[in-house]
Each structure stands twice: as structure tokens, then as C-alpha cells.
Amino acid sequence: MRRFGRVLKTVLILFFLGISIPAEAQKHGKQKAIEKAADLPAVIWRDPGNISTLNLVYGAGGIEHAPDSNGTYTFDKEDMNGTSPKFDVKDGQGVKWRIKLGQEPQAETAATRLLWAAGYFVDEDYYLPEVKVQGLPKLRRGQNFVSEGGIVHRARLERKEKEIKKIGNWEWFKNPFVGTKEFSGLRMMMSLLNNWDLKKINNSIYVVDGEQRYLVSDAGATFGKTGNNISRSKSDLKGYEESKFIEKETPAEVDFEMHSRPFLLTAVDVPNYHERTKMENVTKHIPRADAKWLGQLLGQLSEEQIRDCFRAAGYTPDEVEGYSKEVQKRIAALNAL
């Protein structure tokens, strides 16, 4: 019996070592990557060039990186992070994609195109109304978006390139770009898109082509109504149209509308309440000159290009028209400052 106990103890030790050693190695590898990237230049924006020629149907990845709408994808693993259902797949060429389901796929697809057009770094996101996935188990989240034969409905596909390494997250109030017009522009884009989920975890730092790229890597909580945990929404045309864009202006600064703090009576999570209250300041005290700069950039977009952002996201013709008109109104408001 004692011998059995010793054997069992040895097995358990080996089991836990088998779990902890790879985890420690992964942690050590990530730390080395962070240290190696420390001397690389940090960038948050690049000149988009001739904005009027950009293809906003395909966005940052272009047609070259677009997923095969008729292809079959192979299930890899489910991702339980965040609030939206997500899982990873591989296509026939071995390219890895992260599929997101729920309320965010359409809004995020459109949002990344507008951010990219303004010169900001984004993930390569595409929207497909249907995706066939083989080997798909019963999902712990999002099973209601799956029909017989492994057909997944209303999916956002994010291309995962091996060459891109995530080394961390960044904060709105502490980063290398505070005080620059490019950073002011990104702050204003959050109001233009009505992105109310401005948590640090949604901002990533990628190492790409010898530089550290700072980007908003989750823009799914957009094109709805900003507000508390009861009133806010995503991908909600009526809520977006009825939202105020510019809160107030002075000769020197502009405050843009942003509501994020929880309803006071539901604020049992005090740290979350404080975090979301602070988020409302992300879009405040923007230099007027910076607002004009962003307006001039976005003003180069044609009405058709703006519509393409929403067509690419699978919205109906009426929704495409509604969202596009509201975006145009907000761009016009920037240029009228």
C-alpha cells in the first residue's frame, strides 16, 4: 500500500511538472521577446497615403489575405477569454484564423476599416455570413451560431500571422504618444465609432517589421450607443444615429461624447466602476487643431468608400446607408470646427 502511495505521489509530481514547465518556458519566452523589443521604435500611426484610393471592402489585409468564403476550415481550439464567443481554425493553406461570434463581428469589421483608412494599425478582419468548419465540437459559448454540418453563421475572421508577436498591452493615459496629434486622432476615433469598451486589455502592442505597433485590437463594442451597463449597445444603428458626437468645444479644445461608467446602483465592482469612469476622459480635452487634422484625413474618403466599410461587414443595404450617413455627419462636424 505504501509502495502504491509512493508511485501515486511520483505520478502526481510528474504530472504537475508537465504542466508547470511549459508554462514557465512560455512566460520566460515572452519576457525575452519584450526585452528584445525594448529598443525597437514605437509607432501608433503611419501615413495612409492617398486615402481616396484605399480599398475598404478588403481593408488592411487586402484581397490577398482574404479568407476563402467557399473553403473548409479545421477547428483548432476554443478561446474562453473576453465576452464574445471565439475559437481558432486553420484554412487549407495552414493559415490560422480566429473566429468571433455574437454581437461584435459586423461592427468590428467596419470599425477596423475606418481606423485603417485614418492611418491606424488594425488586425486583418473579415466578415463571412457562413463558414464551414470541420471537426467542430459543441462550443461552450456560441453554439447557437452553429447549424448542422459545422456551418458557423455571422463570423468575423481575424488572420493570425506567425510573424506578428504580441508583447503586451498599453494604457490610454500612459504611453509614448500622449500629447501627439496622432494619439489625439485615435482618441477621437473612439468617439466617432462609439467604442465604449476602452479597457487596457483591448489595446495591444505587436512587434512587426522591426517596430512596436500600438493598436486597438478589439473594436467590437462599436456602432451602437455609449452608456452604462444597462443602456449601451453594439452594432445598433438607431442607438448610433441618436448619439451625440461633440459634447462641447472651446477656442482651444474639444470634448467628445463618451459614456461608459456603470449604473451607480449596480456598481458592486468598485474597481470596474472607477476604470469605466476614467474611460470617459479618453475623448476629452482634444486640441482643436488635432480635431481639424483628423477631419481633413477622413474628409478624403468618398461616400462609396465609407459604404464599403459596412458592406464588407455584411450589413443590409438600409443599414449600410444609415451608418454611412452618420459617419459622414461626424466627419463633417470635425471639419466644421
Show where each model-derived region lies:
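Residue-level detector of family-conserved "landmark" positions at structurally sensitive sites
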Residues: 125-126, 203, 320
